[in-house]
Amino acid sequence: MKMRLQNEILSDIDQFEPSPEGDWRGLDALLTELWQTTKVNEACLPVLFRVFERFPDDSSAGVCWGIVHGIESTDLDYEKPLRESLARRSSELGQIMLHRLEKWTASAQ
């Protein structure tokens, strides 16, 4: 199987829609592909946060938590793009990430 470029995976994530039955496995597979085959960098953040904006109430049956855990496992400084995303459209998981980030920052001082 040919490894796809990061921008191809991100494009598919950006265009993802769950099935009418509420099947999110396609996004789960795309996130797995992104985390396992590419070096996630700052350029990925807007696309990943747009998923939160498109589905602000997280009806993903836990799939979008993969974005939270994936980003939090990197050493990326994601606070600014997260705040920009929340300014465009508040989302449940975006708010959770911001709260966790602020809590971690406060405890690290």
What are these regions (language model features)?
Residues 2-13, 40-53, 76-86, 107-109:
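Amphipathic alpha-helical scaffolding segments comprising HEAT/armadillo-like alpha-solenoid repeats
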Residues 14-15, 78, 89-108:
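Alpha-helical interaction scaffolds
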Residues 17, 52-56, 71, 86, ...:
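Alpha-solenoid helical repeat architecture
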Residues 18-29, 44, 53-57:
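HEAT-repeat alpha-solenoid elements in large eukaryotic scaffold proteins
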Residues 25-39, 62-73, 95-107:
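Structural detector for internal amphipathic alpha-helices that build alpha-solenoid repeat scaffolds
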Residues 43, 62, 77, 92-93:
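Structural detector for tandem alpha-solenoid helical repeats, activating at a conserved register
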